[in-house]
Amino acid sequence: MFLTRISINHPVFATMMMVMILVLGLFSYGRLGVDHYPETDLPVVVVATTYTGASPESVESEISRPIEAALNTIGGIDTITSESYEGRSIVVVQFEVDVDSQDAAQEVRDRVARLETKFPDGVATPQVTRYKPEGQAILSVAVSSTSRTLPEITTLATRVINNRLSVISGVGQVSLIGSSERQVLVVVDPDRLGAYGLAVSTVIEAIRGENQDRAAGTLISGINQRIVTVEGRIANTSGFNRIIVAQRNGYPVYLSEVATILDTGAEVTSLANYQGQTTLGLHIVKVQGANTVEVASAVRREVSALNAELTKDNVQLTITRDNSRPIASQVSQVQRTLVEGGVLSVLIVFIFLNSWRSTVITGLTLPISVIGTFAAIYALGFTLNIMTLMALSLSIGILIDDAIVVRENITRHLQMGKDPVRAALDGTNEIGLAVLSTTLCIVAVFLPVAFMGGLIGRFFLQFGVTVAVAVVISLFVSFTLDPMLSSVWCDPQSQKTAKRGFFGQLIERFDQWFEGLASRYRSVIYFTFDYRKTTIAIVLGMFVVSLLLVPRIGTEFLPPPDQGEVSISLEANEGASLDYMAAKVGQIERALREFNYVSSTYSTINSGEMRGFNKALVAVQLVHSSQRRLKTAETLGPIRRRLSRIAGLEISVGQRSEVVGSIKPLQLSILGDGDEELRRISDHITSVLAAIPGATEIESSIEKLRPTLAVRVRREAASDLGVSIATIGDTLRSLVAGDAISVWNSPDGETHDVVVRLPAAGRENAAQLRNLPIATARMDDNGKPIMVLLDQVADVVESTAPAQITRKDLSRDIRISSNIEGRTLGDVVADLKAAMTKMDIPVGFRISFGGDAENLTESTAYALQSLAMAVIFIYIILASQFGSFIQPIAIIMTMPLSLMGVLLGLLFTGSTLNMFSMIGIMMLMGLVTKNAILLVDYSNLGVREGKSLRQSLADAGAVRLRPIVMTTLAMIFGMLPTALGLGEGGAQRAPMAHAIIGGLISSTLLSLVFVPVVLTYLDAFAGRVRRWVPSPTGSNASAQHDGSDKTKTPACALTSQDQLGTTIM
């Protein structure tokens, strides 16, 4: 091969090429970002619209539905979902993964902009944003103090802490949870307002008018000019008391006479608890593309510096959640398995070659290939994440394979008595085409994997490309560095007459035993030739029996990672207050502290995905895996059973998926129009699901009604008194919800809202609402507006309304979700689907699965498509190598043999069929062809030398047994550290190695006897077909086929000189 010849003739040039690869790789490694999973630009666009005061029904009909209809005509949409709350609409448009997210967002903006003129008055401009997975917090910090009030802590956090953290490189946003901003609160007295005949709007306008500076122009005198300003800004909070809001009987009415002015904190609308104590929570979000580990490390350093500075102020910052910790831990663990796998693989080489020089020559392939791959990872814009590092760790045994085969063949030629240069050239040339084919087969497998569709395709893109690049670099090193070193670095130990030390003699005895094994294997091949049908029947029987194991191996989308964190979502009845929810969260936290493996708890109410006073999320950090006997998944059951004893809450315990973002793996939607029928179907499915073993914590999003107070204006009475609906609405909003009507500039230069509102004790029940004074348009004899009570112009009725209305794909949507315990997701879904086939679903209604169940179905389909493409590509490569359409069939028939080992490996280790193990199976398809290629390639060489097919196959088995066993053991031992699943997250990666190792063992053992037998059948078949295919005159195909096994040239082992007529089979 020309690469080999150039390298041997120019050893310095070959060395410098390796140095260049190492330099580029090391330089790139230092600049690679570190993340858990590959960053994905998911084409998901969110349209958020505010319609203050509107009921969920109004929001649905006037906002959500028109937006859905307008967006539904955009091309490339996967699903449209909407949620209509009181005063707010959220429409989420999920596009197909191949759609550019920026283009999708712009298209949505254009469509929504055309609708704005058709929206009712009072609808705010819709906000169109792209969903970004990296928008999740990488760190959470609790700010606490034993002497400062919450408003003071909030001010400190806003002015100092937030600013210091926000300027850190890579930090995109710092959001506050449980904050209480300082404000000037004008607490109005409704009785005094009524007594003075003052509308709340009069008070508001007075404050706005008096608390402002007004520019009055400029005075110009010669060359000088001065700006004239009317200074009306209130200098301190006490100054608000002197604002005159009206004149009564010739006397001013001051604001202090109808309201109390408080310098206080805003009413808390969210809460954060750490270890049972109320704190101010800071959630830090990184910018897209930033190195998660580096950003988190910088934030930790800054937090330490802030703690040192704020100790004198009695303020403490504590990191409550650090999502970079499991990332750094798992990346470190994968790197360690990579090194361990490399050491084990090299050890296998030493045992078989019994030469430390040969081991070094072969082992150099590993660091060069791995480090060189870092350059490609950097050039392609990838990061060091679980996918890329796992690709390298699983490829360790594969990367050394080419070097093993090349070096072993060179050693064999050295033992023939050839000089090192000739042995390096001949040995590489003889095996080169087979090595090239095996590498191309692996690349052929991962090309389709790299371009799988769906969400999972985005994640495995980097895995597939990394494996493909790594094996190509290892092939290059095997064809250049290994032959060059073999030619210039003489290895006396490669000779059988070399003197050995103690360990060398032990290995030599092993070598002698292996030579005997190879000889016995030759006899086994001849034996199978005599019992070909029996051999085929036994192998096929074993394959069929192994398929019976499939039902015993569960299926799931992704195995849960053991990251040492449990997520608990809590939901109380609609209408529950923040205080009620805080008390319930306290109960949950106290119960969790009963478990000795719980390290800390961090709870948030009305924050993030759990929006609403009745919703909370508790993040439970477990002690390190070395300090507990149970895996994270095993702690869920005890925690679930303990928390179920706490009444008044719907509780869901699970592990949050970083891929799909949900806690509950089983989710389905019931779609259709007709609330009663939707409710009936939902109740039926919920009851069916509850009866299925393994389904737990079942929830339905069937419209939950929240208590409301409906103010129904009596129009005739209101009209007679001159009271408009707008007046009533504005008055109630200001008094009940509170209005930020102005801004106060404090002496320290900060600005704070001025808010008008009723006291908390004055807005607790309907009776207080009925007695609120409303100013009419009529005046009394003194010119004051006549005041009436709300009860005189409106009825205040206790009622209920849907808390939210959910829609999907233009239909009403009820979502049912469930956790899984004690069984796999696939088993539960299969039982549910079987039960649903017996259900009577009316026309116009349909059921669709979501969450992990949908991802599992979709990803399995994509994996099967990619597998089919991989088999086709492998056939193309093999047919091109062997110049035959028949021989590749024998090699491809070894692929199913690996499934026996896959199923047994998964069964014995307790692993499931999931996306990791499925990718392992695909990877296996490229690996199992390696052994058969080595056999067939050497067999064809014997045939071309005039040997019979049976003799050449027997010789090939005896000669190629050593490299076959070496490469197989190198791959197995290279993947062994990953298969053990040690460390955090190791259990999630292990199924891929379990599948590959099991498949390698079964395919190696069976293909050694199966491939030779199949080739004899295919040769006979090709011989019969050749009789019907015309051959050019003079072709060697015109030779008589006498049926003699010892003298014929097999039809399926055709040389490169054969013409089309003889090679078509």
Swiss-Prot record:
Keywords: Nodulation, Plasmid, Signal. InterPro entries: AcrB_DN_DC_subdom, Acrflvin-R. GO terms for molecular function: xenobiotic transmembrane transporter activity. The keyword Lipid metabolism does not apply. It holds the Pfam family ACR_tran. GO terms for cellular component: plasma membrane. It comes from the Bacteria. Residues 1032-1041 have a biased composition (Polar residues). Residues 1032-1052 are annotated as: Disordered. Residues 1-33 form the signal peptide. Involved in the production of Medicago-specific nodulation signal molecule. PANTHER family: PTHR32063, SWARMING MOTILITY PROTEIN SWRC. Belongs to the resistance-nodulation-cell division (RND) (TC 2.A.6) family. This is Nodulation protein NolG. It comes from Rhizobium meliloti (strain 1021) (Ensifer meliloti).
